[in-house]
Amino acid sequence: MARGTIASHISQFPIGTYKKAHAHGPGAHVIILSGEGYSLMWPEGEEPQRFAWQVGTLVVPPNMWFHQHFNSGPAPARYLAFKHWSPRNAQGVPISWISRRLGGTQIDYADEHPKVRSLFAEALAKHALTPRMDDVYAAEIPNLPPRAA
C-alpha cells in the first residue's frame, strides 16, 4: 500500500430498492450502517449466492465476483464502502461503473439474472412490502447501449 489511499463512499437506498450488480478487484469492504437486506454474490458463469445482512454486517465481495445489494427491510438501508485506491494508477472511470454492453463489469437492470426480481419480491413480501423499482427500470431503458452482436 505504499503511496496508496483508501477511497470510500456512503450510499443510502430507499425501502424496496436495490443496486446494480457489478464486479471489481479485491479489497472492497462494505459495512452495513442501517437497514436490513441481502447481497447476491457470484463468480462469472455461476448462480448467485444470497447473503443476508443487518446493521454491523461486513460484506467483502471476492475478487471479480459480481455482487448486488438489496434493501428488503422496512427502513432505508445505508452502507459505508471502502477499498484501496492508488491515485497514481487511476485511469478514467472505474470498469465497475461501465455497462457490460460497453465492456465494463456493471450489469444493467435489463440484463440482470432472471431470479433477481422474483427473489427480491419474495424478500419484501416477508415485511408486507413491494418493490419500488419500476421507475428505475423505465429510466434506464432510453440510455441503454445496444447489446453486442
Where are these regions (language model features)?
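Short acidic-glycine-tyrosine-enriched beta hairpin
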Residues: 43-63
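Intrinsic, low-complexity N-terminal interaction/targeting segments
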Residues: 1, 5-9, 39-41, 46, ...
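Glycine- and acidic-residue-biased ligand/ion/polar-headgroup-sensing regions
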Residues: 14-15, 24-44
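Histidine-centered metal-chelating micro-motifs
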Residues: 18-19, 58-59, 64-69
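Short histidine-centered beta-strand/loop micro-motifs
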Residues: 18-24, 50-52, 70-71
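Double-stranded beta-helix
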Residues: 70-149
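Conserved hydrophobic/aromatic beta-strand scaffold that supports enzyme active sites
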Residues: 8-12, 29, 50, 58-60
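A short glycine-rich, His/Asp/Glu-containing loop-to-beta-strand
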Residues: 1-20, 27
